[in-house]
Amino acid sequence: MKRFLPFVIVAALLFPTFSHPVSAAEGQSAELATKARSAVLIERDTGAVLFEKNSQQPLPPASMTKIMTMILIMDALDKGKITLNEKVRASEYAASMGGSQIFLEPGEEMTVNDMLKGIAIGSGNDASVAMAEHLAGSEKAFVTMMNKKAKQLGLKNTHFANPTGLPVKDHYSTAYDMAMMAKELLKYDKITNYTGKYEDYLRQNTDKKFWLVNTNRLVKFYQGVDGVKTGFTGEAKYCLTATAKKGNMRVIAVVFGAETPKERNTQVTQMLDYAFNQYQTTPLYKRNALIVKASVSKGDQKKVNVVTSEPISILTKKGASTKDVTTEVKMNQDLKAPLQKGEEVGMLIIKKKGQVVSQSPLVSQGNVKEASWWHLFKRTMGMFNHSS
């Protein structure tokens, strides 16, 4: 059973606070994204907003929707629910998807690995629906999972109606929410093996070999870009959620509603340049870093490893000091079995000169099953005998 953090800590997670390195006034004054309907620029590890323009305005996200689709795929892989070599059969419905596709045929089987390529590189609508059906049983059930995950991430201005981004009523997101989704997706290090690849092939060694070229051209033309997802429909115009890493710093730039692909890429390029010229990050922890061993009551094991859920860094203006940084661990009270791998069990709070600069969930590294009454009885008797 999940135990919840005190309200103050939950609120701080959903609405992060940052120290002086992140100044809204500085970000707003920058001449960026002048030819986009909305935009946002964040640093990945802290989630700090470096620039924004109409970033909370709900708009159609087009194929950037597939960022959430990939989150759920990567989460299933991470938890061992599926494997990369597992075969996925395309239904007649999945194969019927229009728009960008990898031309799946009804009944055709591809591995999860190839489906991921088709989604991340080729923006395949058919591959997205095939994976949705494979994971949830139906597209409708998968959409429910998408919206549940959006709620878990605290995304208040996002609602999905399909896993593809094809135009449909009641399907929208914002630049800020899309950046938070990209932040979540990038927790999975291996995702950039797909989103960062400029070209690849499907159906190798067959007469139906299919060439994939990344719809995100910045992967090839901007050093450090290795994701994440483009989008286009007549209503949405040209959209892009991009990420780039230089040195220790990874940033995410989102643009909605550019008139041309060139304008879209120019807006994103300028935002990336701004981030790398103005800011720096100092890494503190990698994802899955062991923070503490916590006691678990009524579990088949007495303790569980508590680890970071994402990379954790300190963000400052270039040249600023990173001294006086401290960390504080706040565990959920009364951890009880069962616990699931990846379940939130506490919070790591990062402070600089006593002020909170970022906060990040701590999670269980593995599963802890509920102990049987016999197991608990033997444990109790062992403690009794030991004390005697």
Give the predicted meaning of each segment:
Residues 1-6:
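Positively charged n-region of N-terminal signal peptides that target proteins for export
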